[in-house]
Regions:
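Cross-family detector of peptidyl-prolyl cis-trans isomerase
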Residues: 2-6, 18-164
Length: 164
């Protein structure tokens, strides 16, 4: 238990002591951010490391599974696109989807896991560690819109409109 608290304090100091332009190790910074985020009110953490917050629980008993398709609204950002209240900052998204249809089994592991927890008309914020995202590979081309650096925590605001 002491080790966990020591690690938490150390990571918190690293996180709060750095400015964005001073980040030397993006992986460590993202891991520290997730440790701090997990302590916030309303954050639920799964055994895989996915964290999520229920904004609106949704209705009914039907949840998506790997064989389903979903109709969703979503926005995605990195930890640099979140304000102090945990809200996504407009204009800092790497991805903004309108009403989009996608297969649950066609997305990254953390996004699929989050979708499977939702009910129709529900709205969640998913905090996806790099292990459930793009790993150490990243996504896209550096310097272009939509680029996701390696080891990035991905944050998605997702509204589940329909399941079919």
């Amino acid at each position: 238990m002491k080790l966990k608290w020591t690690l938490f304090i150390l990571l918190t100091l690293i996180f709060t002591g750095c400015k964005q332009e001073e980040w030397k190790d993006w992986k460590i910074h993202n891991e520290a951010w997730l440790v701090q985020n997990a302590t916030k009110e309303g954050i639920i953490k799964t055994h895989t490391g996915l964290q999520y917050k229920v904004i609106r629980p949704g209705i009914g008993n039907q949840r998506p599974d790997d064989l389903k398709q979903v109709l969703i609204n979503y926005r995605g950002t990195l930890i640099t696109g979140i304000d102090a209240n945990g809200d996504l900052i407009a204009g800092r998204e790497f991805e903004v989807g309108k009403q989009t249809v996608m297969g649950v089994n066609t997305v990254i592991a953390g996004f699929a896991e989050g979708l499977k927890k939702m009910h129709k008309s529900g709205k969640y914020i998913l905090y996806i560690p790099y292990q459930l995202g793009y790993l150490g590979l990243g996504q896209g081309t550096k310097g272009t819109m939509g680029y996701i650096p390696p080891y990035s925590t991905l944050i998605y605001e997702v509204e589940l409109i329909d399941v079919f």
